[in-house]
Amino acid sequence: MLSTLALTGCQIESSTTTTATQQPSVSDASHYQSIIDAAQGKPSMDVLRVYISQEPLLTDPAQHQANIDSLWLMLTQMKPEQIQGIEADENILLGWVDLLDIYQNNKDDPEALRTGIDDWKTRYPHNPGAKNLPTALVQGTITKVGANPRIALFLPMSGQGQVFGQAIMQGFLDAQKGLPSSPVSQASTAPAASQGSGNDVLDQIYQEVAATVNENANTEVASSTVSIDAVPTNTQSVKVFDTQGKAMPQLVAQATSEGYNLIVGPLLKSDVQAIAQMNAPVNVLALNELDANQLQPRTNLCYFSLSPEDEAKNAANQMRLEGKQMPLVLVPASPFGDRIAKAFAEEWQAKGGGTALMQTFGSTASLKESINRGQGIRMTGTPINVATQGVEQANGSIDAVYIVATRDELTLVKPMIEMAISSRQRPALYASSRSNQGNSNADYRFEMEGVKFSEVPLLAGANNNLRKQAQGKVNNDYSLFRLYAMGIDAWSLANNYDNLQNNGQFRVNGASGMLSVHENCVIYRELPWLQFKQGQVKPAQ
């Protein structure tokens, strides 16, 4: 039965024209897929013919590439004695078999393989592989980056994304020159009278005065527990490509023709998706991350971003380390808030926690209306639904709250929480870096007493000389500080690119976090925690 259906497909494939009565349809593609599924991956010439017949009917780029990738996988799994009986009019099938021969003869020599593929394309210009090579074959043509990669930096250098692209570029190029050394911690230089006096009132007065004197300065954190590693050296010139309004295939072709063997970028998610779908024949460190269902293992594609989901996972880990049992996630009422809550819950349960709860809040105006009516935020919520099985519903009162809010929102949310609870039931409060905007005055710091928040090492006291250097480059804009830190770490990752795919133990203390590599070569950032304490910002205890 399989043979008969496959040969029927072969007749459609071998026709050079399609009449009105033979117009292919979605049902034809589904019919061929049912034959493929029935074969259960068992290699055969008949199933190869079905793949070939199905290919021109697939209009979705992802499905089309999947067809080619599956055909190639099956072809590489076949024994030589299975590849026989090719008819004279089966030019497509003959082309694939010829390409297999080129691959097997040159798979250990990427340059020779590329040359062989180029020659093959001229001989089989109508083969679907001439336009869309199998992903595994493309990856076989890519050489390692090496210790001194030639880097093409893909960033928006004009248009609305220009300010973000420039901040990343500045950090990237400054890292190439080397980072300034970290100064000796100033944590031990306070007057002796304020240390160990045992007089809490005098200590607080001293700290408040010191904070007020420096109110207009950028609050620095002196931390000996957070560090930023030295960056690799590479004297190769870096070329910046403006991605604004440009098509990724043309930019990639230009970069590779000019001899660049590593692309860092692009930044915009739509561009990252385009470069992933085009199966680019070059190593790529994308500066954004695709959704989980779009990620696929590629030996030449890694993802690095300032992911707020990573911060949520950090918060879940921190609460578990501190022995918290019943967390509430307080997020904006938006798809963004839903994503953050889900990321927190998944990590919380992965670390052995029960079901986490979620509550949303509205705009700043609605928060002000609520606080004017004396309406607080009660410690209740709805369970966050994640795919984890067998997780028990946690019982008891809320003992920790993770707040994802802007600074203006946090100044309303914190007192609203305190309005609705008694002092004996006060939960620990944790916030994301979203609320830390810098230049906070003494009143704000005292108002936020006890709140812990995550922040990138560059802003958490790891290297205040580097922070001062960045301050002059980004006009003291905290959001741009973080992008500058991302640029520094992109440089470190780019110059360690070969280790990212092959070393699950890879770690680097970066300016944007402690970096490690997770599945599908996604870079994960672990952030340090700070805390508002007696009018100052200090490393969290």
Name what the model sees in each region.
Residues 474-540:
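Segments of small-molecule ligand-sensing domains
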Residues 414-488:
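Extracellular/periplasmic periplasmic-binding protein-like sensory domains
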Residues 11-14:
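Bacterial signal peptide processing site
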Residues 167, 186, 192-292:
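Beta-alpha junction/loop-to-helix N-cap segments that form part of ligand/metal-binding clefts
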Residues 262-265, 269-343, 347-357:
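Extracytoplasmic ligand/sensor domains, especially the bilobed periplasmic-binding protein
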Residues 259-268, 285-287, 328-332, 380-407, ...:
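Periplasmic-binding protein-like
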Residues 68-171, 177-186, 196-237:
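Long amphipathic alpha-helical scaffold segments
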Residues 6-9:
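C-terminal motif of bacterial Sec signal peptides marking the signal peptidase cleavage site
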